[in-house]
């Protein structure tokens, strides 16, 4: 990684820390920074802050059970989705390839739609029952992984990356068609529940679930970082990569597994999140002005984490008026970037 890449990553780390703090102190209930710091780091004893927390005992619960897990989820999910987008754009040499294009998000949505229909709409929009929540989580994960395995199967039969991309798009269309049919026959409550899930939300991971969620995401990100050199070779074309000794099909399959795992876990917990995986790699590429994955991949992960935290912050800005749907905010940031990329490559 060059000096420019290091400076960029340091800058992004600073932005992440600042946005993380803002996510913890802002919301429908305003909590002082000193109180937030005291809750997260109890050893930083301060008598005045301790008295404040005694007067407002709910602050600790709000921070530890709502804002902190939500901020950490946004950070990890943003990094994961952005990494998935960059992996797919490089592997298929298509600037508009993204996690949603290959139908993995649609697979997760299909799993959730099946569960909500089979439960007869018993999964309420206000709060899931324990069994309902676990069913939705498992259904989203299984649906996403099944689509990934299906793409893995086609990948063993099709050598062309372009053809595999087209197959992925078609699989996504089929999944979305089945979802539409299921919604047509579902109860009103079931349709409403599915729509709420489909809006996306970083608040789906509790502190108790965070170790599992973080472990899987970090494992996927580490696996992605190990692919930086093969990704650089793929940039120059499949034939050139093969001449360098890269097994293109095996590399492509490994990238699909990484993408499927990260998309499955993030979509299962957070719902389908639009544009972050598609737009953030272009943001990092434009700011760094490089295609070298030794710099670009870590920078994309950090940029994705910062963008997701920013989106989460924008969602909670209305305060007491409510929380904006995540997928109502992400296109506002992502769509202009995609339009710019299309116009640049016209």
How does the language model describe each region?
Residues 1-346:
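Alpha-helical transmembrane segments in inner-membrane proteins
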């Amino acid at each position: 990684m060059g000096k420019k890449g290091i400076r960029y990553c340091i800058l992004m780390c600073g932005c992440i820390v600042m946005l993380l703090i803002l996510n913890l102190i802002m919301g429908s209930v305003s909590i002082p920074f000193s109180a937030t710091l005291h809750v997260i780091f109890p050893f930083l004893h301060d008598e005045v802050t301790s008295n404040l927390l005694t007067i407002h005992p709910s602050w600790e619960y709000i921070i530890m059970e709502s804002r902190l897990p939500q901020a950490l989820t946004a950070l990890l999910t943003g990094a994961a989705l952005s990494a998935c987008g960059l992996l797919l754009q490089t592997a298929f040499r298509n600037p508009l390839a993204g996690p949603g294009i290959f139908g993995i998000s649609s697979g997760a949505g299909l799993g959730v739609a099946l569960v909500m229909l089979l439960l007869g709409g018993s999964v309420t929009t206000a709060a899931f029952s324990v069994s309902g929540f676990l069913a939705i989580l498992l259904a989203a994960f299984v649906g996403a992984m099944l689509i990934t395995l299906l793409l893995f199967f086609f990948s063993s039969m099709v050598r062309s990356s372009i053809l595999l991309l087209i197959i992925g798009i078609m699989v996504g269309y089929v999944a979305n068609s089945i979802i539409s049919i299921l919604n047509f026959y579902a109860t009103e409550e079931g349709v409403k529940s599915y729509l709420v899930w489909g809006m996306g939300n970083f608040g789906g991971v509790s502190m108790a679930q965070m170790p599992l969620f973080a472990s899987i995401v970090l494992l996927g990100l580490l696996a992605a970082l190990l692919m930086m050199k093969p990704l650089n070779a793929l940039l120059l074309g499949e034939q050139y990569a093969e001449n360098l000794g890269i097994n293109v099909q095996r590399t492509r399959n490994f990238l699909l597994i990484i993408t499927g795992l990260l998309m499955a876990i993030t979509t299962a917990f957070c719902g389908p999140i639009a544009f972050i995986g598609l737009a953030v790699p272009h943001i990092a590429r434009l700011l760094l002005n490089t295609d070298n994955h030794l710099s670009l991949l870590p920078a994309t992960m950090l940029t994705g984490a910062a963008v997701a935290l920013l989106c989460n912050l924008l969602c909670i800005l209305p305060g007491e008026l409510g929380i904006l749907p995540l997928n109502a905010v992400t296109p506002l940031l992502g769509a202009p970037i995609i339009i710019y990329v299309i116009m640049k490559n016209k």
